[in-house]
Amino acid sequence: MAQTGTDRVKRGMAEMQKGGVIMDVVNAEQAKIAEEAGAVAVMALERVPADIRAAGGVARMADPTIVEEVMNAVSIPVMAKARIGHIVEARVLEAMGVDYIDESEVLTPADEEFHLNKNEYTVPFVCGCRDLGEATRRIAEGASMLRTKGEPGTGNIVEAVRHMRKVNAQVRKVVAMSDDELMTEAKNLGAPYELLLQIKRDGKLPVVNFAAGGVATPADAALMMQLGADGVFVGSGIFKSDNPAKFAKAIVEATTHYTDYKLIAELSKELGTAMKGIEISNLLPEQRMQERGW
């Protein structure tokens, strides 16, 4: 019989990352840079989202050799991505002992109808969301941590801002509702009624919600924290910059001290050029990774 972790334990692991930065890395060297810069965790990948976007084709789980290399290189938690709905990729990563699995729209979905039943796993999961409906559906499936979808690999923060603001606005709306209005709101959002009741009672989501997708500068990271993010994922931004080590430290500092504008100004000096970035309106519908999943 497969073991499963309790929600309390899995969500507690996510709470421990609160206020921190999680960085995408593709090898042991990058993982060490991230750890030394103060990252609370790393995401082991074969290619960062910008390279996945540029290469096209089918993006799958990283080679286990890369994941193991990163796990052996650092003492901080290691996450890895599995395709949406790909049961075996997730089980393989769990068997390898990763600390967290990201059921990620950055990779090509394996199942366009069903997400993983994350309640059946011992390892905790993080999932992306654009609104409260997506957020609560993923939580009901067993996600222990959420993140904005943003638009990965673009270096453009606009979609992450949109998603964070939308989720938080919808949470505030639910909190202000009377109990007899909640069932209709659950129907409108496609959200489990019991979770909306819990959100109304607690005044917040039952799991942490990080910012992800388009964080490219220290100011971007600070912006997302001000908008209510519990922490920040940085994908392509750090290792696509001119000075990754300095850039990584600046992102971590800006995330921690997100209202210290003089410090953020100093952190932003002489970082070199940030990743070039992509204007969202130039993307074709099929290039929009955030549309993957439901």
Curated annotation (Swiss-Prot):
Any GO BP: amino acid metabolic process
InterPro entries, A to Z: Aldolase_TIM (IPR013785), PdxS/SNZ (IPR001852), PdxS/SNZ_N (IPR033755), RibuloseP-bd_barrel (IPR011060)
Active site as annotated: K81 (schiff-base intermediate with d-ribose 5-phosphate)
Catalyzed reaction equations: aldehydo-D-ribose 5-phosphate + D-glyceraldehyde 3-phosphate + L-glutamine = pyridoxal 5'-phosphate + L-glutamate + phosphate + 3 H2O + H(+)
Residues noted as binding D-glyceraldehyde 3-phosphate in the record, renumbered to the chain: R165
UniProt enzyme class: lyase
TM region positions: none
Keyword Cell wall biogenesis/degradation: no
One Pfam family cited in the UniProt record for this chain: SOR_SNZ
Intrachain disulfide bonds: none
Keywords: Lyase, Pyridoxal phosphate, Schiff base
Binding residues for D-ribose 5-phosphate: D24, G153, G214, G235, S236
Molecular function GO terms recorded: pyridoxal 5'-phosphate synthase (glutamine hydrolysing) activity
Protein's pathway: Cofactor biosynthesis; pyridoxal 5'-phosphate biosynthesis
Xref: CDD domains: pdxS (cd04727)
EC identifiers of the protein: 4.3.3.6
Reported function: Catalyzes the formation of pyridoxal 5'-phosphate from ribose 5-phosphate (RBP), glyceraldehyde 3-phosphate (G3P) and ammonia. The ammonia is provided by the PdxT subunit. Can also use ribulose 5-phosphate and dihydroxyacetone phosphate as substrates, resulting from enzyme-catalyzed isomerization of RBP and G3P, respectively.
Known partners and oligomeric status: In the presence of PdxT, forms a dodecamer of heterodimers.
Family, as annotated: Belongs to the PdxS/SNZ family.
Protein name: Pyridoxal 5'-phosphate synthase subunit PdxS
